């Protein structure tokens, strides 16, 4: 079949082979034998491709070539018919044939090419073409088979061949050479009856002087480029060739007509006055460049043009005379023409014959189409580029030339245009655009850039394209996915099918997905997605991409393979705004609207690989320079491929899978429980108890068509929600849940709601078996449009969604519990278990939430691998039970519960049924029995635990029955399985009884059921075949004592009574746990403390003490839990009042935790040097200070101790504020802080309760709910808030001596000392004169204050607390004056007592001298390393009351009675109140075993027969009870079984003591009641004061003055209910005058 060729695109490629093989031109010789064949690798002729070879024969029939689709419809066959070549082919069962006009059986060489272009196939024979065209349903040919030359093997089944009789066709006889697919040589797979060493025309070696022979149009041609000779056989000297005379021109003349182009410049000669009309033309020029692609010369338009360009380093010529394009490409033997060396090009045309030669040697000759011979052009002659190169007709490239051009000359029969010279002399018809330099300068190469990480990207300026535009670039990578280019336009509100506003934008993008290149375009009417490659392009080779658009239509070319596209709608304008992103997207995408169809963006796939030669609208972009200017992270200005595989060094840790990427290794951490570049960082774990969840609230509604989801989970339940996406506006969801021990994936795209035509409801997949085994399991979900893949461990399930709708909408990602339930008919069961490494589309959400990297995380689950006890219920007696609705377990069953008991026997679960069916679970002699009857008689399965389970520990029980009637009982880790034959269904009726039965039911139980009593103990986490009942609220009937929670029967301190190093403290009828230094809270210190997450932008929590209530301390305790990944940051800092400079700071430096503090001398620091703590794990740090001594401990690591040398001050003066987060100091902390405790203040709890003294700013977010501060009764373990603290208030004496001369041998107390600083602007330890606002004596009162909300100190076992020997007869010595006794009346303070204002006259100040267990020796000198101060232990059974009565004090003298010294009794305490500002002081009587009181050093007790214990403190009565005035009780002091909390010793040079545990917290509370005998007490008080005045009136050691504005204790109410006591203000007056009224007071 012969037809006229219109617009046939013929490409003739000259490829020079290397070495001796080329010189010999070896080929295949076919003998024409039966069953002869040569088999080559499949030729992809599906859409666009070329195949060529040369042959010689003398026969008229024979099969040349054959391929097909495996016996269906499509085939292509070349054969000889009557001496001519016939092309016969079929597509989609539509067949045609083409027959050449030329005879070929003439024993001459012939060149044959088959060119495929979708519906058209062209047969080219010796430059003449015949085409055949089909109009099938599909525009491509399906090729399955390999390619056969010379014949088809007879062993192939005829049914597998599409063309009937092809095997019977006679074989080809002759020679075939140089078979190529495009430019590449295919691989020979095998042959039969073929001689492989046939010589071609080059076998005679016709080329002289080392020239290389190759075939051109069937004739041998010589390549003389490397010989220095010319001519047809390389036999002529080049200097004698007149055709090359221009090479002999002087260098000066050559340089005169040369110009440099840099990509934006070009020359334009106007032909409108003198149009070209010629039948023969000649173009000559020389070029020099580093550039691979660029326009050299162009003239003409429409279908009449000449285009000369550099394409991928080869010279390309395209000529169209009106009947179709002729293209010739000339390539060098070695390398490319873009080698920055001069190359000469000569193009000649004579009528239809076209010849192009490069460097006078490489020559290609061809013919234009049809009979058109005239070239006409009245347009422009472009040199070096054009305004829009991509839009020029026939242009194979889209960018301008970069390099040097010289002596560009066009001539025909009529004119000669020396274009370079005309530009140089500025001819009027020649326009010069850009800065063209008329000499050859070096043009900087467009260096490639390498994106080394997926996060790397650079920003390009806005692409100003409206109706047309072009982009070209080269890329190279080995990774399959990555976003290469993206830009979009202005958001526009449009209504979608849901009749809702939807933000749409015009956008343009190029992405690499699964190794294929895609173009995405939306011009306002919908997105098109064009696949531009037929094979994967991530093989590490360079690929050239050229995109050209004109209105709605355009093409994308990859390595010259073009794919056309047409945008949707009618608009021809692409409206873009903002930057264009190359290589990826920025981390902050707030201003970006990402299209749903752009999967790489939604999946967070950044491009990793190289990009070079980026041209936009023909103009180059120096992307290397842009990357340097933007300081782009992860972008390198070079491109080289590492030869060694990166995974050979096994870089991935923790059994992660290593994959080789582009010059990097990729560690797949899925399933390892770790994350990071090498999977070195442990991923955070969330624990769920059925009431907990984590909800990620997306900042905006998300729409995706592709998702990657992975996580690990561990659970003992067979049911429960794992992860789900939910929408507020639709039923769209991607949900993963446990369903009967399997993972169920359900995807619902709500197709019905948006009026889709085809929908079958949610798509469901299942994978995995028996996953409720309390082991880690890994889940992965991959969705790409309609394709679904679910993988659980190694079990894979795949599916395809039905319908055209692929978009998933969601507002939230939820775990544990589904809170968005509006569009859900059946709510999934809550999850009980652990979740880790949740990654959704590249984001690790659990760790992002924990570290504060995201602000839209709602967290109720708890971090850490915790022992989960969900919704526990206590059955306090064996007669207690409850009933629930019938257990639904007809075909299968999954039961789970936890129990804890000390009883060996008891009913746990029972449900009777129809007939004999029943199920029972019981505890028999400490072992679980599972008893059941399905109708075949009762069976029992007994648990095989290693020991009885009534050990007061929690145990897990799982009972399952599957469809095959296999029953299994798992107790903790032990499993027993039994297969039951016969009936398979369990038909239950009536109530399900839990923990027991009604009394009358025990006598009617089936046999094999042993229990005759109920269960006494705790049940938790009860799961009844997927249903999580609330045992209390869902009960149909309850009987006996059933309580929520599980306190357990233990009322004494055990080793495990308090978790997380909490301190167990024995109480009267129970125990409490001191959680102060643990960062935890709750009854047993196993609940998280108040937790705040500090974001990356920094935050600050600032607590400020009231101005009149600023403490000063000699010792401090600080504890906090944290997790972070920062290397530097301040966690907590406490500062003194302005001007003092004292501070204490907890910080992380170089990843290690440390504390630095200054209390008046130099900075003292202590640091944990061994291990960094910025590993993202949860750590608890504990710090104690006693004077200059300090301890620091992290978790259970060894304690760091620091004892500074030399003289050290000890008091931390006038503490003013606590700053948490480091933002105020510029050292930001990012991460989680939990349970902060400092000297009695739980600052984070106070912040969560909106304490008015706390301010919060910056990125700070509270996690979950604030732990309850309400206590329980004393008979059970109590929370740490219901505790008592000991406060000892001392003031320092000002003396006339200097500090250097003072003695350092003073006695130090071991308790924390809170020192009233009286707001002095100087250090309390520096004897600088400080004048208070008033004068007078100052009281020094050791106080024991009952604090209802502070944490108790440690209780220890010790002998009786003894009294100081010097104060047995009468312990109270008070000196005062009449003036000082009138303080109360002068203050005029209001009354806020419990009784109201009427009871104020009878309120009093209750004073107790019972301190922290220290003794006082009167023989010791009254000296201290800073001040003279004394503390006395004093117990009174009367109270010293002060009230407004006749302008003075009423005082009750204390007295001692022998009944006060009884063991296990507490002395009577009277409660009175002076005003609302008075503290309640409760004193206790120490028990004594002897009447003698030995002398003991301060802070020590006589414990010779005891093991070392922490410091002795006294436990007060709880404030929740009224004191019985008729009974005397002594404090209970026990020895708890716990690890000591490290505590710094007092500052004492040269002595190191075992750290104790003590704290000082100052609180106040109101007192009630009236003191009897006011008058007698006042009289006694006056006598004592007079005696004291007489004895001490002549002392010259300085005096204390009473500041009447501050000597009352204020009750400043706090938001959390505690009362803060105002400090007493002191004055240091080392040089003050002595006045007679100055007195000293010791109480």
Swiss-Prot record:
Compartments, as annotated in UniProt: Presynaptic cell membrane
Function: Neuronal cell surface protein that may be involved in cell recognition and cell adhesion. May mediate intracellular signaling.
Pfam families, sorted: Laminin_G_2
Gene that encodes it: NRXN3
Extracellular domain ranges by topology: 28-1568
Protein keywords: Calcium, Cell adhesion, Cell membrane, Cell projection, Disulfide bond, EGF-like domain, Glycoprotein, Heparan sulfate, Membrane, Metal-binding, Proteoglycan, Repeat, Signal, Synapse, Transmembrane, Transmembrane helix
Signal peptide: 1-27
Matching InterPro entries: ConA-like_dom_sf, EGF-like_dom, EGF-type_Asp/Asn_hydroxyl_site, Laminin_G, Neurexin-like, Neurexin-related_CASP
Ranges that cross the membrane: 1569-1589
Domain EGF-like: residue ranges: 198-235, 643-680, 1049-1086
Chain positions recorded as Ca(2+) 2 binding sites: 732, 749, 807
Residues the record marks as carrying a glycan: 58, 105, 757, 1189, 1257, 1301, 1317
Biased composition (Polar residues): 1303-1318
Gene3D superfamilies associated with the record: 2.60.120.200, Laminin
An example molecular function term from Gene Ontology annotations: metal ion binding
Region spans: Disordered: 1294-1318, 1611-1643
Post-translational modification (record): O-glycosylated; contains heparan sulfate. Heparan sulfate attachment is required for synapse development by mediating interactions with neuroligins.
Residues of the Laminin G-like domain: 28-202, 258-440, 447-639, 685-857, 871-1046, 1090-1260
Subunit structure: The laminin G-like domain 2 binds to NXPH1. Specific isoforms bind to alpha-dystroglycan. The cytoplasmic C-terminal region binds to CASK. Specific isoforms bind neuroligins NLGN1, NLGN2 and NLGN3. Interacts with CLSTN3.
BP GO annotations: adult behavior; axon guidance; learning; neuron cell-cell adhesion; social behavior; vocalization behavior
Protein's name in the database: Neurexin-3
Cytoplasmic side: 1590-1643
GO cellular component assignments: cell projection; plasma membrane; presynaptic membrane
Binding-site residues, Ca(2+) 3: 1142, 1159, 1211, 1213
């Amino acid at each position: 079949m012969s037809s006229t060729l219109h617009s046939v695109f013929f490409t003739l490629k000259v490829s020079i082979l290397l070495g001796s093989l080329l010189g010999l031109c070896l080929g295949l010789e076919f003998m024409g034998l039966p069953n002869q064949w040569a088999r080559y690798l499949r030729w992809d002729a599906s859409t666009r491709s070329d195949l060529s070879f040369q042959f010689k024969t003398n026969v008229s029939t024979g099969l040349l070539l054959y391929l097909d689709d495996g016996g269906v419809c499509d085939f292509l066959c070349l054969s000889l018919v009557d001496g001519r070549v016939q092309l016969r082919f079929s597509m989609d069962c539509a067949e045609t044939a083409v027959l050449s006009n030329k005879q070929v059986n003439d024993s001459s060489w012939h060149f044959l090419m088959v060119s495929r272009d979708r519906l058209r196939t062209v047969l080219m024979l010796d430059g003449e073409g015949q085409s055949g065209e089909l109009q099938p349903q599909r525009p491509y040919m399906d090729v399955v088979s390999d390619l056969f030359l010379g014949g088809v093997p007879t062993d192939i089944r005829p049914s597998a061949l599409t063309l009937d009789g092809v095997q019977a066709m006679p074989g080809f006889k002759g020679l075939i050479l140089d078979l190529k697919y495009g430019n590449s040589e295919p691989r020979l797979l095998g042959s039969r009856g073929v001689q492989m060493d046939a010589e071609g025309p080059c076998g005679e070696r016709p080329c002289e002087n080392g020239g290389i022979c190759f075939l051109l149009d069937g004739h041998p041609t010589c390549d003389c480029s490397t010989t220095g000779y010319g001519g047809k056989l390389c036999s002529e000297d080049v200097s004698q060739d007149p055709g090359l005379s221009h090479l002999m021109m002087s260098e000066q003349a050559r340089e005169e007509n040369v110009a440099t182009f840099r990509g934006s410049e070009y020359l334009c000669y106007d032909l409108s006055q003198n149009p070209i009309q010629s039948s023969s033309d000649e173009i000559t020029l020389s070029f020099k460049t580093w550039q691979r692609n660029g326009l050299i010369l162009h003239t003409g338009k429409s279908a009449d043009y000449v285009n000369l360009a550099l394409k991928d380093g080869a010279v390309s010529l395209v000529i169209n005379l009106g009947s179709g394009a002729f293209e010739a490409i000339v390539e060098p033997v070695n390398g490319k023409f873009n080698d920055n060396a001069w190359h000469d090009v000569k193009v000649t045309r004579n009528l239809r014959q076209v010849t192009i030669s490069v460097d006078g040697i490489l020559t290609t000759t061809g013919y234009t189409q049809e009979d058109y011979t005239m070239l006409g052009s009245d347009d422009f002659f472009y040199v070096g580029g054009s305004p829009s190169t991509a839009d020029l007709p026939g242009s194979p490239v889209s960018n301008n030339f970069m390099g040097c051009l010289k002596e560009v000359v066009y001539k025909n029969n009529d004119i000669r245009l020396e274009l370079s010279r005309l530009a140089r002399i500025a001819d009027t018809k020649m326009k010069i655009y850009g800065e063209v330099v008329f000499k050859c300068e070096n043009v900087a190469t467009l260096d490639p850039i390498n994106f080394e990480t997926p996060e790397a990207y650079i920003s390009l300026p806005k692409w100003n394209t409206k109706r047309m535009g072009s982009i070209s670039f080269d890329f190279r990578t080995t990774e399959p996915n990555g976003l290469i280019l993206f830009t979009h336009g202005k958001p526009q509100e449009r209504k979608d099918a849901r009749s809702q506003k939807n933000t749409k934008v015009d956008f343009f993008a190029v992405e690499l997905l699964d190794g294929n290149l895609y173009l995405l375009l939306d011009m306002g009417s919908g997105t098109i997605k064009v696949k531009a490659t037929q094979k994967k392009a991530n093989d590490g080779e360079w690929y050239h991409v050229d995109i050209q658009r004109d209105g709605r239509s355009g093409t994308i070319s990859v390595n010259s393979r073009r794919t056309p596209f047409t945008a949707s709608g009618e608009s021809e304008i692409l409206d873009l705004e903002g930057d264009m992103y190359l290589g990826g997207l920025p981390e902050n995408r707030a201003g970006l609207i990402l299209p749903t169809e752009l999967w790489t963006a939604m999946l967070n796939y950044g491009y990793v690989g190289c990009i070079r030669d980026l041209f936009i609208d023909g103009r180059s972009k120096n992307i290397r320079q842009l990357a340097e200017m933007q300081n782009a992270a992860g972008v390198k200005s070079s491109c080289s491929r590492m030869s060694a595989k990166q995974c050979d060094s096994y870089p991935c840790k923790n059994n992660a899978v290593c994959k080789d990427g582009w010059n990097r290794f990729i560690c797949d951490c899925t399933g390892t429980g770790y994350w990071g570049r090498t999977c070195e960082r442990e991923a955070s774990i969330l624990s769920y108890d059925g009431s907990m969840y984590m909800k990620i609230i997306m900042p905006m509604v998300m729409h995706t068509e592709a998702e990657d989801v992975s996580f690990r989970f561990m659970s003992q339940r067979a049911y429960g929600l794992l992860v789900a996406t939910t929408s507020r506006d639709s039923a769209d969801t991607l949900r993963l849940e446990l369903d009967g021990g399997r993972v169920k994936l359900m995807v619902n795209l709500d197709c019905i709601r948006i009026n889709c035509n085809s929908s079958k409801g949610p798509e469901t997949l299942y994978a995995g078996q028996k996953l409720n085994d309390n082991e880690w399991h890994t889940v992965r979900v991959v969705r790409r449009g309609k394709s679904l893949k679910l993988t659980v461990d190694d079990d894979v399930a795949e599916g395809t969604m039905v319908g055209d709708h692929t978009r998933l909408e969601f507002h939230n990602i939820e775990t544990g519990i589904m809170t968005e339930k509006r569009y859900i008919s059946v709510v999934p069961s809550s999850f009980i278990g652990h979740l880790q490494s949740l990654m959704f589309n590249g984001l690790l959400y659990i760790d992002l939430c924990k570290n504060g990297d995201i602000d839209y995380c709602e967290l109720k689950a708890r971090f850490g691998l915790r022992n989960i006890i969900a919704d526990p219920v206590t059955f306090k007696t064996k007669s207690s039970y409850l009933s629930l609705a019938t257990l639904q377990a007809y075909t299968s069953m999954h039961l789970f519960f936890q129990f804890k008991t000390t009883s060996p026997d008891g009913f746990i679960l029972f449900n009777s049924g129809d007939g004999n069916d029943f199920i029972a679970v019981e505890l028999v002699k400490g072992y679980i029995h599972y008893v059941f009857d399905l109708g075949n008689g009762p069976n029992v399965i007994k648990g095989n635990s290693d020991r009885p389970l009534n050990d007061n520990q929690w145990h897990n029980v799982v009972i399952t029955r599957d469809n095959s009637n296999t029953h299994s009982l798992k107790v903790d880790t032990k499993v027993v399985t039994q297969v039951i034959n016969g009936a398979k269904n369990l038909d239950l009726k009536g109530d399900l009884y839990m923990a027991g039965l009604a009394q009358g039911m025990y006598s009617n139980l089936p046999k094999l059921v042993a229990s005759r009593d109920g269960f006494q103990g705790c049940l938790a986490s009860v799961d009844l075949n997927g249903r999580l009942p609330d045992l209390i609220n869902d009960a149909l009937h309850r009987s006996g004592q059933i309580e929520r929670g599980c306190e357990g029967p233990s009322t004494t301190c055990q080793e495990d009574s308090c978790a997380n190093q909490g301190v167990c403290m024995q109480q009267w009828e129970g125990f409490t746990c001191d959680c102060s230094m643990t960062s935890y809270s709750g009854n047993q210190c196993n609940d998280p403390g108040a937790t705040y997450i500090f974001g990356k932008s920094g935050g600050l929590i600032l607590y400020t003490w009231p101005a009149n209530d600023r403490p000063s301390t000699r010792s401090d305790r600080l504890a906090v839990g944290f997790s972070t990944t920062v290397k530097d940051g301040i966690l907590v800092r406490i500062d003194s009042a302005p001007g003092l400079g004292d501070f204490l700071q907890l910080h992380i430096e170089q990843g290690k935790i440390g504390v630095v503090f200054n209390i008046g001398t130099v900075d003292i620091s202590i640091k944990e040097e061994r291990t960094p703590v910025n590993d993202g794990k949860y750590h608890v740090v504990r710090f104690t200070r006693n004077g200059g001594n300090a301890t620091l401990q992290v978790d259970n690591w060894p304690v760091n101790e620091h004892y500074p040398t030399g003289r050290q001050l000890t008091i931390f003066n006038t503490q003013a504020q606590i700053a948490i987060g480091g933002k105020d100091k510029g050292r930001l902390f990012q991460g989680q802080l939990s349970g902060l405790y400092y000297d009695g203040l739980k600052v984070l709890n106070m912040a969560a309760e909106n304490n008015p003294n706390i301010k919060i700013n910056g990125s700070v977010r509270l996690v979950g709910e604030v732990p309850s501060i309400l206590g329980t009764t004393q008979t059970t373990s109590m929370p740490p808030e219901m505790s008592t603290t000991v406060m000892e208030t001392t003031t320092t004496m000002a003396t006339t001596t200097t500090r250097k001369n003072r003695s350092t041998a003073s006695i130090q107390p071991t308790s924390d000392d809170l020192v009233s600083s009286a707001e002095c602007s100087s250090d309390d330890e520096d004897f600088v004169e400080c004048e208070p606002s008033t004068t007078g004596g100052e009281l020094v009162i050791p106080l024991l204050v009952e604090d209802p909300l502070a944490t108790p100190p440690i209780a220890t076992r010790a002998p009786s607390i003894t009294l100081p020997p010097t104060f047995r007869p009468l312990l109270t010595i008070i000196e005062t004056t009449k003036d000082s006794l009138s303080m109360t009346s002068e203050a005029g303070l209001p009354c806020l007592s419990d009784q109201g204002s009427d009871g104020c006259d009878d309120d009093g100040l209750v004073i107790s001298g019972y301190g922290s267990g220290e003794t006082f020796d009167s023989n010791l000198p009254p000296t201290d390393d800073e001040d003279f101060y004394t503390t006395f232990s004093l117990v009174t059974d009367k109270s010293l009351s002060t009230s407004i009565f006749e302008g003075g004090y009423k005082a009750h003298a204390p007295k001692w009675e022998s009944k006060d010294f009884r063991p296990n009794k507490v002395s009577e305490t009277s409660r009175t109140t002076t005003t609302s500002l008075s503290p309640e002081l409760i004193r206790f009587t120490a028990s004594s075993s002897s009447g003698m009181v030995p002398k003991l050093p301060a802070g020590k007790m006589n414990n010779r027969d005891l093991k070392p214990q922490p410091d002795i403190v006294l436990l007060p009565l709880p404030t929740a009870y009224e004191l019985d005035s008729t009974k005397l009780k002594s404090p209970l002091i026990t020895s708890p079984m716990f690890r000591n909390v490290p505590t710094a010793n007092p500052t004492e040079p040269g002595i190191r003591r075992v750290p104790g545990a003590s704290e000082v917290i100052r609180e106040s509370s109101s007192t009630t009641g009236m003191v009897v005998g006011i008058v007698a007490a006042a009289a006694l008080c006056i006598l004592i004061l007079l005696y004291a005045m007489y004895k001490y009136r002549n002392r010259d050691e300085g005096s204390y003055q009473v500041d009447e504005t501050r000597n009352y204790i204020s009750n400043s109410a706090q938001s959390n209910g505690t009362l803060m006591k105002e400090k007493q203000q002191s004055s240091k007056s080392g040089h003050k005058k002595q006045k007679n009224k100055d007195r000293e007071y010791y109480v």
